[in-house]
Regions:
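Conserved phosphate/pyrophosphate-binding and hydrolysis machinery centered on Walker-type P-loop NTPases
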Residues: 1, 5, 14, 28-39, ...
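Intrinsically disordered, low-complexity and often Lys/Arg-enriched segments
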Residues: 1-10, 36, 152, 163, ...
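Dynamic helix-loop-helix/coil hinge segments at AAA+ ATPase domain boundaries and subdomain interfaces
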Residues: 11, 17-19, 63-85
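Interdomain "pre-motor" coupling segment immediately N-terminal to P-loop NTPase/helicase cores
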Residues: 17-69
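Conserved P-loop
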Residues: 84-162, 212
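Residue-level preference for the first positions of well-ordered beta-strands
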Residues: 103-105, 166, 199
Length: 257
């Protein structure tokens, strides 16, 4: 490698162009071998740098997302989940609802794929360089309560609640909220109203949600009013995936009497 090569790579590093620094000579040789133009060479190295930056951005977004694992729409079995509205679900994956700050609510019994679809939407958003946050309702309440007790609620709200363009809250209704927790959750929905998209999953119909919000019917109604104003409600029916797997290996669920 000659001194000119060294100078080019040093300049690339100073300009924060690491991908070009490592690959420019390869693209130069490739362009020469294909009788390409200077413009072809410039386009090739800029395309390479852009792709590398996109990949680094996606890796950071994935690390910060809270997604426990990668799920995709392609992994979702519509042949088994016959109660899932396929056309409605597929349309959500164009992610236009995020650009419009609209919400999505997945309703259905345990095991029908609500969390799978919400995680898949989150992953698709990350692949489009959209900042997301996935969290269970229980963990969200724990973090909100801790921030409130420490006098850091405003900071937490700004960073964790308003920061993500898409906030995914899983398992609403599995554990009931106390009065203070219900108020904190209402503030989450109220602050994100028409500012960012929120995805909720719940095993409870809307008519029973107040049971999870300290039986506060008024607060629940106000929360739903904001949540559902610009919202795609996806009702999924069917048998639990997990129950299906147990049956396949010969484990029968116990029936309470």
């Amino acid at each position: 490698m000659n001194l000119q090569y060294d100078r080019i790579e040093q300049l690339c590093q100073k300009l924060n162009l690491p991908a070009i620094a490592s690959q420019w000579s390869h693209h130069a040789q490739q362009t020469l071998g294909q009788d390409g133009s200077y413009a072809d060479f410039v386009e090739a190295i800029l395309t390479h740098e852009y792709a590398a930056r996109q990949q680094r951005s996606q890796q950071v977004l994935m690390k910060l997302s809270g997604l426990p694992q990668v799920k995709t729409l392609e992994d979702y079995d519509f042949n088994y989940a016959l109660g899932a509205p396929k056309s409605q679900v597929i349309e959500l994956f164009n992610l236009s609802f995020i650009a419009r700050a609209e919400n999505v609510v997945f309703l259905g019994a345990s095991g029908v794929g609500k969390t799978h679809l919400s995680m898949a939407l989150g992953y698709k958003a990350i692949m489009n360089n959209i900042k997301i946050k996935f969290i269970t309702a229980a963990d969200l309440m724990l973090q909100l309560s801790t921030a409130y007790q420490q006098g850091k609620l405003k900071t937490y709200m700004q960073r964790a609640v308003l920061g993500p363009k898409l906030l995914i809250i899983d398992e609403i209704g599995y554990l009931p909220f106390g009065r203070e927790e219900a108020n904190l959750f209402f503030n989450v929905i109220a602050k994100r109203y028409e500012k960012g998209s929120t995805i909720l999953t719940s095993n409870l119909p809307f008519s029973q949600l107040s049971k999870s919000f300290a039986d506060n019917v008024t607060l629940t109604a106000a929360m739903l009013d904001r949540l559902l104003h610009h919202c795609h409600v996806v009702q999924i029916s069917g048998e639990s995936y997990r129950l299906k797997d147990k049956k396949r290996i010969g484990i029968q669920p116990q029936v309470e009497t």
